[in-house]
């Protein structure tokens, strides 16, 4: 699994909104650094941490912190990710429309945990897929050949999606998946931990 082009947005507006109930905007002490990163001041960070720990009714502001990221992952992982439908959007590369557009190679598939015997068999599957693809391209794009590719395609095939989500969704994912048996979820949780103020606003680890 690979994470690229991560962007965290709207932190300033989310923190300002968190102060609306108490009209305490005068206590805001955050600012942008020279690189354009929004740095929370002590007052704002203290408020954000207290609201985060007070429960979902009090931490509405975390739903207003948005994240965009390009994730490349195998189809078997996307099947699990797709259970998170609330406050997530994803635009994916099209398997149906573009599967034939370039040669198949073993690196199109997640195979890092395969035994040597299974990897050798996987090479024959990839070879068969490429033979079907060439037949499809050279013999008039017959639907039978297209179906052969689609139905033979292993769930380890890697797909890239541009995903958007918010910090509340990431709280739910982090605590539901951090002990999952799939290594991809452990990588996902480490990516979450790398986000700005993830320790305080998502993981909310005790000091």
Question: What positions do the PLM features span?
Answer:
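Family-specific signature for flavin-dependent thymidylate synthase
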Residues: 1-207
């Amino acid at each position: 699994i690979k994470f690229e082009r991560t962007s965290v947005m709207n932190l300033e507006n989310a923190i300002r909104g968190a102060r609306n109930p108490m009209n305490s905007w005068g206590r805001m002490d955050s600012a942008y650094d020279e690189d354009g990163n929004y740095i929370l001041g002590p007052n704002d960070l203290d408020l954000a941490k207290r609201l985060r720990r007070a429960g979902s009714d009090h931490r509405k502001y975390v739903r207003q912190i948005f994240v965009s990221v390009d994730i490349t992952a195998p189809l078997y992982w996307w099947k699990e990710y797709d259970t998170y439908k609330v406050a997530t959007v994803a635009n994916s590369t099209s398997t149906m429309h573009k599967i034939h557009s370039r040669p198949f190679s073993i690196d199109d598939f997640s195979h890092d945990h395969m035994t040597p015997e299974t990897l050798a068999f996987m090479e024959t599957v990839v070879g068969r897929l490429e033979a079907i693809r060439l037949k499809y391209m050279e013999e008039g794009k017959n639907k039978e050949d297209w179906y052969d590719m689609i139905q033979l395609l292993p769930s380890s095939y890697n797909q890239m999606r541009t995903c958007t989500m918010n910090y509340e969704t990431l709280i739910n994912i982090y605590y539901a998946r951090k002990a999952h048996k799939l290594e991809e979820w452990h990588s996902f949780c480490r990516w979450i931990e790398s986000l700005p103020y993830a320790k305080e606003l998502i993981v909310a680890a005790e000091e």
